[in-house]
């Protein structure tokens, strides 16, 4: 027979396991900004590479619309959607405090 004391102990253990599992499965911190732009795709990529490198990111790569870089556990991306006159700035990594700081640095260098 379960006593109230063992029921409370079981509930506490279950809640602890649930909290630990939630932390283990937490996703990365993602910080974003955007701005309108009239620049060309080539200009956007040029400034994107400069901004990402100036913020201390390396291993710069390009896709058809985006420029990426890495800095430790963080990834930065600048997506140039020139057809819609929009540029997206994205930084993802493990810290909710650091990701926005890196994003601000990249945005300011663009």
Where do the model's predicted regions map?
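Generic anion/oxyanion-binding catalytic loop in active/binding sites
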Residues: 15, 33-34, 88
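Bacterial N-terminal signal peptides
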Residues: 10-19
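A cross-family detector of function-defining hotspots
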Residues: 50, 56-75
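Bacterial N-terminal signal peptides that target proteins for export
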Residues: 1-11
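Terminal, regulation- and interaction-focused segments at domain boundaries
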Residues: 23-55
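A broad structural signal for short, well-ordered beta-strand segments within beta-sheet-rich domains
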Residues: 29, 57, 83-87
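Mid-chain, structured segments of secreted extracytoplasmic proteins
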Residues: 67-110
């Amino acid at each position: 027979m379960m006593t109230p004391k063992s029921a409370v102990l079981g509930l506490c253990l279950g809640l602890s396991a649930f909290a630990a599992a939630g932390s283990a499965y937490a996703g990365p911190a993602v910080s974003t900004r955007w701005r309108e732009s009239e620049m060309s795709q080539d200009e956007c990529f040029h400034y994107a590479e400069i901004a990402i490198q100036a913020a201390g990111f390396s291993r710069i790569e390009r896709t058809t619309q985006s420029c990426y870089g890495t800095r430790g556990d963080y990834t930065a991306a600048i997506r140039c959607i020139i057809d819609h006159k929009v540029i997206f700035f994205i930084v993802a990594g493990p810290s909710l405090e650091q990701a926005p700081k890196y994003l601000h640095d990249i945005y300011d260098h663009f």
